[in-house]
Amino acid sequence: MFVKKGLLLVVSGPSGAGKGTICKELLKENDTIKLSVSATTRKPRTGEVDGVNYFFISKEKFEEMIEKGEFLEYAQIYDNFYGTPKAAIMECLEKGQDVLLEIEMQGAKQIKEVCPEGVFIFVLPPSLEELKNRIVGRGTETEAEIEKRFSCAYEEIKMIKDYDYFIFNEDVKTSAKEIEGIISSEKNKVSRYKNIIIEKFKEEL
């Protein structure tokens, strides 16, 4: 057998769609998938741990990392910056380990330009009404922030055209299983591994 390069799994969706909860469930059931920890300038939410959920850094530190070219992608979302550190991800993929990125649409677009072979998955809410209920239910945003996120949701959903797959998140466990199915399918995709397969059997002649 040959060692398959790891899959870069990029999961996005509008705020409140539940992408973070789905990713937690996916990681809980699949210890072979490594979560890429993003850096952000926003303040931690209740229960979030530095270095686990995000690297919470200052705006000055973030700008320094941009200057050094240490991000695979970065973007400004609302009033904060988010970025994906590059080195650790590339190392994991070369070793054959799958890496999961939960990022916003701006960041995903940059990732696709650099890593077009990635697997891009868009998480949709069952409805816009349910989306708003989820954002309100988090209790982490002010009323103005809630309205800002909700008003952006439709524009964000229109960006689905840049993705490979979509899932409607009505149930977290079901959604995680759907992503597992996508991973299985991608790992046996001829277009992804055809050259390696042909080379393997050529060497055996």
Swiss-Prot record:
Enzyme nomenclature, EC number: 2.7.4.8
Enzyme type, top EC level: transferase
Compartmental location: Cytoplasm
Catalytic activity: GMP + ATP = GDP + ADP
Keyword Ribosomal protein: no
GO molecular function term, any single one: ATP binding
Chief location bin: cytoplasm
Entry keyword Repressor: no
Superkingdom per UniProt: Bacteria
Keywords: ATP-binding, Cytoplasm, Kinase, Nucleotide-binding, Transferase
Domain Guanylate kinase-like, first and last residues per copy: 6-184
Gene Ontology cellular-component annotations: cytosol
Residues binding ATP, per UniProt: G13, P14, S15, G16, A17, G18, K19, G20
Pfam families according to UniProt: Guanylate_kin
UniProt function note: Essential for recycling GMP and indirectly, cGMP.
Family statement: Belongs to the guanylate kinase family.
Protein name per Swiss-Prot or TrEMBL: Guanylate kinase
Gene (name only): gmk
